[in-house]
Amino acid sequence: SVPKNKIFKTLNSSGTSGKKKSKIFLDSNNARNQQLVLSKILKTIIGNKRLPMLIIDKNPKNIYKSEISAKLAAINGFSIFGREHSYLLNEKGEIDYLNLNIFLEKYGNTNFLIFGFTSTVYENLFSKINLKNLKNNFSNGILIHGGGWKKMESIKVSNAEYKKKLFNKVKLKNIYNYYGLVEQTGSIFIECQYCNDLTTSIFSEVIIRDKYLNVATSGQKGFIQVMSLLPSSYPGHSILTEDIGEIINKNSCVCSKYSTRFKIHGRLPESEIRGCSNI
């Protein structure tokens, strides 16, 4: 691990069970590599230019600390790929229509980036938003969202229904789900826009293991094991999660990505509900 005098940033684990959270210590080199790889992955969606960015959350500037939670780490990590940042929610957690309309009037007619956690986006852009208070829609938005699927499962909303509901409500059509752990920040698995499967990159891989921890066959559900080349200041190269998924065996997709494709089916029953949206 990294010497104490080389610690650049400390992250709290998003997946640790129990009262005492595991901590991930990053040196400057590891943090930089994570940012570079995340940039390469996101460029396939948003291009090379930073876009105006709407964050579906409260402004976290007053609660940033040296020890950053998974949620704040994700907001920080994605924010560097946007500009002219605006936050949907005020300090009370309510939709700030004044701020939202200023953003949409200025940037709504061109491509803009939206980031948020799955359930928070759904709660605010579908359940709570009042269209009568809007002066523009989200048709030019590019939404990247992750985490919070446990909450969506509890209200019986699938990934396909999620996309359909957001389009019908606010005309948001460019929607990308991602899967990732704070323990492997940068090595996210982004959803293919054509087949809607999650995909690996050249920096990461996924293995599915059965209940005996043997490698599962294609199409067989099991525990998700995530692997990344990025960790250099902490032992996070291979992590066996409590998430359940399966490898999707597809010979081809119009995106032409050569990668492992997989789906998430939720978390192991009775495991502790933890993740970015729960912190």
Regions found by a protein language model. Give the residues of each.
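Active-site glycine/GP-rich loop and adjacent strand/helix microenvironment
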Residues: N76-I279
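Active-site diphosphate/adenylate-binding microenvironment
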Residues: S1-N12, G18-I24, K40-I45, N62-Y64
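Short secondary-structure capping/junction motifs at helix and strand boundaries
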Residues: K20-F25, K43-L54, F81-L88
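"Short basic amphipathic alpha-helical interaction patches in structured regions
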Residues: K9, K23-R32, I68-K71, I129
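A short, flexible beta-alpha/helix-coil linker loop
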Residues: K19, P60, G148-K151
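Conserved AMP-binding loop of ANL adenylate-forming enzymes
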Residues: S39-N76
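A broad structural signal for alpha-helix termini and local helix breaks/kinks
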Residues: S17, I46, K169-K171
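Conserved ATP-dependent adenylate/AMP-binding module captured primarily in the ANL superfamily
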Residues: Q34-L51, L98-K106
